[in-house]
């Protein structure tokens, strides 16, 4: 299941994402975050990725937002964000 979900995200990265201007406000990008979250947390990683996409808008903060080691739908604050 993980491989299938990751393949879907990679298909998006290859075929759909290039059609739009760069707009992700975080590092790693939302699609890379989704892949990392799925690899680390399985199906719960999909929920984490969706929550991340919902946080990625012009009014949100920017910066480093790595996948946490534990399941969470909130942004992981890093020392550089303070």
Curated annotation (Swiss-Prot):
Cellular component terms per the entry's GO annotation: plasma membrane
Places the protein is found: Cell membrane
Membrane topology, as annotated: Peripheral membrane protein
SMART domains tied to this protein: Haemolytic
Pfam families for the chain: YidD
Keywords carried by this UniProt record: Cell membrane, Membrane
Superkingdom: Bacteria
Keyword Membrane among record annotations: yes
HAMAP family in UniProt: UPF0161_YidD (MF_00386)
Recorded family membership: Belongs to the UPF0161 family.
Record function comment: Could be involved in insertion of integral membrane proteins into the membrane.
UniProt protein name: Putative membrane protein insertion efficiency factor
Organism: Streptococcus thermophilus (strain ATCC BAA-491 / LMD-9)
């Amino acid at each position: 299941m993980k491989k299938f979900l990751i393949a879907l995200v990679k298909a998006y990265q290859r075929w759909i994402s290039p059609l739009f201007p760069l707009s992700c406000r975080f590092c790693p990008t939302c699609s890379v975050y989704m892949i990392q979250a799925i690899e680390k947390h399985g199906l719960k990683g999909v929920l984490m990725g969706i929550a991340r996409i919902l946080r990625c808008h012009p009014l949100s903060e920017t910066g480093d937002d790595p996948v946490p080691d534990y399941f969470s739908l909130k942004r992981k604050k890093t020392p550089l964000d303070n």
